[in-house]
């Protein structure tokens, strides 16, 4: 055989070995920088709100340079006796300003996010008396980088799955809870290192109430670890391949831009979604209250949508959309707000869900996972949960009309 061919085949085998390794008999994929960048941009798309992937990408690249390995394991390959937990920040719109001022005057040290993220996993692990063997993404957006960094720091994989598939405004809004698995025990760390365990709660709504109140009383910021699950449970209570989908979204939009194609068209095709609107932001009335960002958004149509208006109700995330006063999309289906030139989530550099005035935005609607469309899923994330009187209508039906 030709020596060049032999060398080429050897090189291919080495690449395959680098991409898929076996740790303790487990099939684990080592993610490269391109896959990680695509994942983080795709996660911002999945978030259903404004999201800037660049800070997360910077953190991941710095970690790679320092020698960190980012590993991913599929739900099917994860052992039944393994333990996964979700890690994320929890915010609080309308934080207690007097607490912020007092802690500054006291000179209390604000712990780095990376330290708190690991502290909160240690806290839940100690409480459970079991080692955490993988991290599952709690929600899309910045929580993806959090999960990746915690997993890499602990030299464990991230699960190719999620407990929401999107970003959600409230803790109880999760696929495990729909599947009968509670988020408790839940561990919380404040910016200054206060440690809180929610051992028991009446229901998931109380977990949301308590953890959100801690965030509001902590300058609008806390870190939470929740929803411990074993390998048996994740097989029915997690969204499989959720991170692979994020990689796909990031990849198709990137490649479309690189080849001078329309990234929005590429994403609509990849997500089996619908282009709902193109327009400029002419109104964004924002109010931080009870731990959330509440926003009324209005867009003025451009291009094929000239002469039309689009209104969006936001509670941290995009919840309801109206085209010219008619219902057009609603939670739990996904409403993405994207830059039409890049296909990436718009970047507001402001509060959760913010829309910069004058920004050009493409709105895409995507059918949600089947779990969200169950009776309980609609109770948790449907329009009536957010105070509206109408029933949930799937986006396919709304667009057919």
Which sequence ranges carry the predicted segments?
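A short, small-residue-rich loop immediately preceding and capping a beta-strand
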Residues: 43-48, 130-139, 158-159
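Short glycine/serine/threonine-rich phosphate/pyrophosphate-binding segments
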Residues: 53-58, 117-118, 140-149, 165-169
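Glycine-rich oxoanion-binding loops at beta->alpha junctions
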Residues: 83-131
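Oxyanion-binding "anion nests"
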Residues: 248-301
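C-terminal non-catalytic interaction/assembly regions of soluble proteins
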Residues: 283-401
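A structural-propensity feature for long, helix-poor, extended segments
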Residues: 80-101, 173-214
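N-terminal low-complexity or amphipathic/hydrophobic leaders
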Residues: 34-94, 347-369
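Catalytic or ion-translocation cores adjacent to nucleophile or general acid/base/metal-coordination motifs
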Residues: 63-78, 156-194
């Amino acid at each position: 055989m030709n020596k060049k061919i032999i060398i080429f085949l050897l090189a291919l085998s080495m690449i395959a070995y680098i991409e898929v390794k076996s740790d303790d008999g487990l099939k684990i994929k080592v993610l490269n920088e391109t896959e990680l960048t695509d994942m983080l941009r795709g996660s911002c798309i999945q978030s259903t709100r404004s999201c800037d992937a660049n800070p997360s990408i910077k953190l991941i690249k710095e970690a790679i340079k320092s020698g960190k390995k980012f590993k991913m394991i599929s739900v099917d390959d994860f052992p039944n006796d393994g333990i996964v937990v979700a890690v994320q920040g929890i915010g609080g719109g309308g934080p207690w300003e007097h607490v912020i001022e007092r802690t500054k005057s006291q000179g209390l040290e604000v712990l780095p996010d990376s330290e708190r993220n690991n502290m909160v996993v240690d806290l839940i692990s100690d409480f459970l008396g079991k080692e955490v063997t993988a991290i599952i993404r709690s929600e899309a957006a910045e929580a993806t980088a959090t999960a990746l960094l915690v997993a890499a720091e602990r030299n464990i994989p991230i699960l190719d799955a999620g407990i929401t598939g999107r970003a959600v405004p409230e803790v109880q809004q999760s696929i495990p809870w729909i599947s009968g698995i509670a988020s408790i025990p839940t561990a919380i760390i404040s910016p200054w290192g206060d440690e809180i365990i929610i051992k028991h709660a009446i229901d998931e709504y109380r977990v949301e109430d308590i953890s959100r109140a801690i965030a509001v009383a902590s300058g609008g910021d806390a870190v939470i670890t929740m929803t411990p699950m074993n390998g048996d449970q994740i097989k029915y209570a997690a969204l499989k391949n959720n991170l692979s989908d994020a990689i796909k979204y990031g990849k198709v939009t990137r490649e479309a831009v690189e080849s001078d194609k329309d990234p929005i068209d590429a994403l609509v095709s990849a997500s089996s979604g619908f282009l709902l609107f193109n327009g400029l932001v002419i109104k964004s009335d924002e109010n931080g209250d009870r731990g959330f960002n509440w926003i009324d958004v209005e867009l003025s149509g451009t291009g094929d949508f000239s002469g039309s208006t689009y209104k969006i109700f936001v509670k941290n995330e995009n919840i309801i959309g109206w085209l010219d006063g008619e219902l057009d999309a609603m939670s739990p289906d996904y409403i993405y707000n994207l830059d039409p030139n890049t296909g990436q989530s718009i970047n507001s550099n402001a509060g959760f869900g913010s829309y910069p005035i004058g920004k050009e935005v493409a709105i895409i609607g995507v059918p949600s996972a089947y779990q969200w469309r169950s009776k309980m899923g609609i109770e948790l994330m449907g329009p009536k949960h957010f105070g509206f009187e109408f029933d949930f209508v799937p986006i396919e039906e709304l667009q057919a009309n």
